[in-house]
Design a protein with these regions (language model features):
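A Zn2+-metalloprotease active-site environment signal
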Residues: 2-8, 17-252
Length: 252
């Protein structure tokens, strides 16, 4: 999650697939690519998210509608609501042992069955709320801009097909994985934590699941050696922040 940073540090999130066979004839100069990426409109970001989500869904094993995972997620989704700042959302479950979840700017929310096995409903609600926060607060859009502007999945936006038409299916899939595994700053992580807390309160859900989800991660992180994710806030500290907010709000 983005709660995911802790999960990535534990090595349980999906590995990022590189895009090593791109045709350089289709690329603009790095300066022009960066300009295009940072000029993305909300509509372009949603269009790219639509295609990236479709490509990832096509490669994943989706939980059947009548499965226990889907029925459980449907219940969780009804508690969280059907939109992010007015953007309709759609939920689904990827059947995988990986512990992860993500949300895209088009409302694509995917929860991994490994996460659902690890956490109770209240904790899954909190994790999804955190992911929704990254979308609502613009973090995901900026992550897409960075992916298009500086990473392997950089292609020109042709005036006749638009930026989506300039990406192959594999490149869209790679872009999706970039977004799923995106790293966010400590400030962005804290903002998404607070967004989830506020969303849970607004929806009448006890926010304790946010704290206990971090506490579960902290237990798994114990004894872990220094990693590239050490610049992200520790799960224990994030759990304590939520506990402090709950105490200030008079929540047990």
């Amino acid at each position: 999650m983005k709660i995911r940073q802790a999960l990535l540090a534990l090595g349980v999130a999906a590995a990022l697939t590189g895009c090593q066979n791109m045709d350089s004839n289709g690329l603009l100069s790095s300066g022009a690519e960066a300009f295009q990426a940072y000029s993305l409109s909300d509509a372009q970001v949603k269009a790219l998210s639509d295609e990236s989500c479709k490509e990832m869904d096509s490669k994943a094993t989706l939980a059947p509608a009548n499965s226990a995972y889907r029925q459980r997620l449907d219940k969780i989704a009804s508690a969280l609501g059907d939109n992010i700042n007015g953007q309709p959302v759609n939920y689904n479950v990827y059947i995988t042992k990986d512990v992860n979840a993500f949300a895209m700017a088009n409302g694509c929310i995917r929860v991994y069955s490994g996460l659902m096995d690890m956490m109770n409903d209240n904790e899954v609600e909190a994790v999804i709320g955190h992911e929704m926060g990254h979308v609502a607060l613009g973090h995901v859009k900026r992550g897409m801009q960075v992916a298009l502007g500086t990473n392997a999945v950089r292609v020109a936006a042709a005036s006749a097909g638009g930026i989506v038409g300039s990406l192959s299916q594999s490149q869209l899939g790679d872009l999706g994985e970039k977004l799923v595994n995106a790293q966010f700053s400590q400030r962005q992580e804290a903002e998404a934590d607070d967004y989830s807390y506020d969303l849970l309160r607004k929806r009448g859900i006890n926010p304790s699941g946010l704290a206990t989800s971090f506490e579960k991660l902290a237990q798994q992180e114990a004894g872990r050696q220094s990693t590239m994710f050490d610049d992200h806030p520790a799960s224990e500290a994030r759990a304590q922040h939520i506990r402090d907010r709950m105490a200030a709000d008079g929540i047990n």
